[in-house]
C-alpha cells in the first residue's frame, strides 16, 4: 500500500487516465512503492513534477502494418513504439511480436526499461515497441515481408542517436536482420548502431544472445552465496520458457552444477527427471523453431503436459521464471513454496503478480 501522498496521487492519476492498462498500473505501483523513502526525503521532486514526468511517455507512436502472406492474402496488424524517456540518452528497448501485445504491456516494458538501462551506467533512455503479429507458424518469407512493412513506418522515428530498438519475444536475430535490411534500404545508409541484437555477420555482439540468461544465473549464484552460503551445485532447477533467456539460463545453471528438470513454452511444459538435454532443446527451438512437446517424443523418460502454468507443480530448489509477465500468480507461488524452493530469480519482465510476490518474499 502506498503511504506517501505524492506517490499516491500520481498513481491515482494513472488509474484515472488509463483505467484499462493493468500491466502498466502494476509496474508503476511496484516502482512507486520502492521510491517512497526517497520521495519523503526529496520534497523538490513534487515541486518539479518529477514523478508525473517519470510515468508519462514522451511519445507514443501507433501505426498499421499491412503485409501479404504466401497465399496472396493481405493482413493488417498494429505496430507501436513507446518512446518513454530520453533524459540521459536515446530511447533504448526491444521490439515484441506476439498476439498479446497492446499499449499497456509496451508501456510497462518501456517504463521498466528506463530503470534497467540507467543501472548500466550508460547514457541511454528507455523505450519499447512491437506488434500483435504472431511469427509462429509463419514462413521466413512471411516474417520478412511483415518486418519490412513494420520498418517502413518505424524508420521515421528511430536512429542511432534517437531511438535504438532490439529484440524481445518473437524478435530474434532473424527478425532484427530483416528490420535492419529494410532500414538500410530506406535510409540509404548503413547505421549499424540503429538496432542491437543483430547477427554476428552484420554487426552483432559476441554473447549478446546468452547475456540475459547467463546474467540471471550469475546474479542468482551471488544471491545464494551471500544470503544462504550456498551455490547452484547439486540443486534441482525449474525454468519456465524456452526462448533465449530460458535456454541460456539452463546452459549456465547446468555449467554451475545444477540439474534443470523442466522447461516450457506457451502450450505446455516438459519434465525430464534425469536433466534437460539442452542440445535437443536448442535444435527444436533455435534451429527448427518447433514446439517443446517434440522433446518428449525424442527423449525416453521425459513427459509433456499441456498448459504451461503446471510447470510450477514440479518440486525444485531454484525457480527461474523466464517466460512472460505475470506467469506466476498466487496459485503458482503457493506451489513453488510447497515444493521447497529456496530461491526464485526472475529472468522475464515482471513475471510475478503482487499477490505472488507477497507469498514468495519470506
What are these regions (language model features)?
Residues 308-315, 327-341:
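Rossmann-fold NAD(P) dinucleotide-binding segment
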Residues 185, 221-229, 310, 325, ...:
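Conserved helix-loop functional segments at active or binding sites
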Residues 245-249, 327-331, 352-353:
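Short glycine/serine/threonine-rich phosphate/pyrophosphate-binding segments
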Residues 207-210, 214-310:
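Glycine-rich phosphate/diphosphate-binding loop of Rossmann-like nucleotide-binding domains
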Residues 332-351, 356-358:
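Generic long, charged, amphipathic alpha-helical segments
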Residues 360-362:
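Conserved small/polar residues in nucleotide/adenosyl-binding loops
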Residues 1-206, 219:
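N-terminal ligand-binding/catalytic initiation module
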Residues 320-322, 347:
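Short, well-ordered coil/turn residues at beta-beta hairpins
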Amino acid at each position: 500500500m502506498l503511504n506517501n501522498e505524492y506517490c499516491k496521487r500520481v498513481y491515482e492519476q494513472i488509474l484515472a487516465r488509463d483505467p484499462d492498462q493493468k500491466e502498466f498500473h502494476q509496474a508503476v505501483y511496484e516502482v512507486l512503492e520502492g521510491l517512497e523513502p526517497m520521495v519523503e526525503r526529496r520534497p523538490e521532486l513534487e515541486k518539479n513534477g518529477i514523478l508525473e514526468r517519470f510515468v508519462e511517455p514522451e511519445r507514443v507512436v501507433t501505426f498499421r502494418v499491412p503485409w501479404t502472406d504466401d497465399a496472396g492474402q493481405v493482413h493488417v496488424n498494429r505496430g507501436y513504439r513507446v518512446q518513454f524517456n530520453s533524459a540521459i540518452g536515446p530511447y533504448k528497448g526491444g521490439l515484441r511480436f506476439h498476439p498479446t501485445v497492446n499499449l499497456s504491456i509496451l508501456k510497462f516494458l518501456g517504463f521498466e526499461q528506463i530503470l534497467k538501462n540507467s543501472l548500466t551506467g550508460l547514457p541511454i533512455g528507455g523505450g519499447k515497441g512491437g506488434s500483435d503479429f504472431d511469427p509462429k507458424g509463419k514462413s521466413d518469407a512471411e516474417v520478412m515481408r511483415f518486418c519490412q512493412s513494420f520498418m517502413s513506418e518505424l524508420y521515421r522515428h528511430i536512429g542511432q542517436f534517437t531511438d535504438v530498438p532490439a529484440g524481445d519475444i518473437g524478435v530474434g536475430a532473424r527478425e532484427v536482420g530483416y528490420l535492419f535490411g529494410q532500414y538500410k534500404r530506406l535510409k540509404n545508409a548503413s547505421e549499424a548502431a540503429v538496432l542491437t541484437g543483430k547477427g554476428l555477420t552484420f554487426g552483432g555482439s559476441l554473447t549478446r544472445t546468452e547475456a540475459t540468461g547467463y546474467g540471471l544465473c550469475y546474479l542468482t549464484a551471488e544471491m545464494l552465496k551471500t544470503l544462504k552460503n550456498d551455490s547452484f551445485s547439486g540443486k534441482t532447477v525449474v525454468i519456465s520458457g524456452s526462448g533465449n533467456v530460458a535456454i541460456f539460463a539452463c546452459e549456465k545453471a547446468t555449467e554451475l552444477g545444477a540439474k534443470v528438470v523442466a522447461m516450457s513454452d506457451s502450450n505446455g511444459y516438459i519434465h525430464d527427471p534425469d536433466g534437460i538435454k539442452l542440445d535437443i532443446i536448442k535444435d527444436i527451438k533455435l534451429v527448427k523453431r518447433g514446439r517443446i512437446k517434440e522433446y518428449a517424443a525424442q527423449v525416453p523418460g521425459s513427459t509433456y503436459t499441456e498448459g504451461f502454468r503446471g510447470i510450477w507443480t514440479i518440486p525444485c530448489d531454484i525457480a527461474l521464471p523466464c517466460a512472460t509477465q505475470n506467469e506466476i500468480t498466487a496459485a503458482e507461488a503457493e506451489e513453488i513454496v510447497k515444493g521447497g524452493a529456496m530461491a526464485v530469480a526472475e529472468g522475464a519482465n515482471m513475471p510475478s503478480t503482487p499477490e505472488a510476490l507477497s507469498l514468495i518474499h519470506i
